[in-house]
Amino acid sequence: MLSLSSPPWLLLLVLFFFANGSATVVSLAENVTLATLPSTSPISVSFSTTSSVVAPISTELENQTASSSNLNTNNEASDEQTGNSNSNTSSHSRNINGLPSSNSNIDNANSNSSSVSSLSTTTSAISGVDQQESLILATPTALNGSGTPPEHQTIGQAPPTKGEQEAILRALDWLKEKRASDYGWGNDTHVVILAKELSGGRDPNDSVDGHVQVIQELEDTLSVKEMEIEILAMLDRHHTLPKPLDLDKLARYVLALGSLCKDPKHFHGHDLVATLQHHEPAQDIEFALTTLSACSSAAHVRKRQIRRLLDIASGVTDQSVDAIAMVILALRCIVTDHRHRHLQHFVRRPARGLATLQDQRGSFGSLRSTALAMQALQDLEYDPAGHWNRTAASRYILSRQRADGGWSEEPLQDGQEPDIGVGLTADIILALGWKGLGAVRALQCDHVIRESSDPTENGEPKLAVPFGLSSSAEESDAKNISYTYTLWVGSNVTESFSLSLVSPKNTSFFKAMTQAAEMDPRFIFEAREWPNGHYVHTLYGKKEEPRGYHYWLLYRLPELPDPNNTPGNQLIAPVGVDELMVEDGEHYLYWYKKL
């Protein structure tokens, strides 16, 4: 009976063994096939069986591939953020390489795998594409040399990387140690407050004792009060001595107040923004900074201010990194206003010029210049002609952080302490935190929302594109404008005459001169007509004298000319009398002087 029953049992055992072994062999074969693929092989992902949500991703990223070495170099910031350090073993790095492409080995492996394995592979691949899309949007350098980005792609929306966050916290701790007994930071109180507010300080999820938190808030309040005392003291010195205003510092005070959501137009009875706009700086970088401050407070930016910014932007080859960066920040603030969005394309040229100034180390010169350039260029739409490497810039700055958490320019100058660099450290915090000087306007404080809700700009729907750049239907509006026209005679201004004029919009200065001559005989003039326009050689009976170097020079001024404060050469009109269009609220001066 045993002999008769043995064959069925043995047969069953043999069949069972082969069945299990076969399954194991198939499973191992599949695993071996997948495991032997090189880590740099791009994974082919088909979206034909996925939902419509991921279909556009396949279209936008089709045929784009990236090697693991390039992505590890260019996307270091995002890799730090996700905690990835090894592209060959991490699933995140494998998915980075998983851009849509064709690979017969993968296709064969997928076809040999079971339905469950196929579903798992497809899900993983879709997840990888989702991660890749997020990475591209978060990192300016993700598409370096790997194809055309999606249209209207905005770059730089991701938060700071883990390494940047750690550096910021160390820097904030160092700044706290450097706070003086009056709870200020000397000449850098305003920029430290600005950096602390925009960086967000410590993570609110950090466990901080309630008593310690109250003390920190009180200390921060005392620091703000110290800054307010500094502002009032500066204004008092200006009115009583009188002492010229430090416009650069006043502009930074305005930005710091804005970061605290304090309205600088109502500062203890003072309108700091109006004070800024009343004194126009001669230096381009100071002018751009004051304009940025006014714009960040949602104040009206005058047309002539925008024209000057565009003039500076058009000559970026003659400007420093700091000046170009500040002009970009000012223009970007201006075009956020819906009335000026048609000027947005004027940001592109200076941004391209600035991007070309980045060196192989990632820096833009000094640490301060690099920090300012990072603030100006981040979040801009992708521009192949204006490509820059934020990861390299960040890496360069992080490599220069001192052991105590601060930064300083090296080599140190004679007499400088090794722990200097409070202002520089605050500037770098602004750059690493992805919220720089340009973020003040975006805070949407009450006074900013209130000012921005005004649908008009001095009665006009929006600013017309500056003359000579393009034409606009708004320029043809029959609207009168008011301005002044002044004559000065002599280098020491021995004679002075002024007229207040009202003319139709789009009136050339040559027509304005004709109008003035009809009103007052002292403004009668003579001019030669050349192919490129009129050349004025005689005014008020005074003819130019080339031998004696006496000429008539035309100035376009922000305020009524003052003989005790004569204008500089940077305010000379950039075009001739036929091309110069008179504008509302502007002041024009013809000065007969010796060169």
UniProtKB/Swiss-Prot annotation:
Keywords for this protein: Glycoprotein, Secreted, Signal
Cystine pairings recorded for this chain: none
Signal peptide (residue range): 1-23
Places the protein is found: Secreted
Biased composition regions of type Low complexity, renumbered to the chain: 84-119
Pfam assignment, any one: Cobalamin_bind
GO BP term, pick one: cobalamin transport
Primary site of residence: secreted
Annotated glycan sites: N31, N63, N88, N112, N144, N187, N205, N389, N480, N492, N506
A Gene Ontology term for the protein's cellular component: extracellular space
GO molecular function: cobalamin binding
Region described as Disordered: spans on this chain: 61-119, 141-164
UniProt biased composition (Polar residues): 61-83
Effect of I572V: In RNA edited version
Name recorded for this polypeptide: Uncharacterized protein CG3556
Organism: Drosophila melanogaster (Fruit fly)
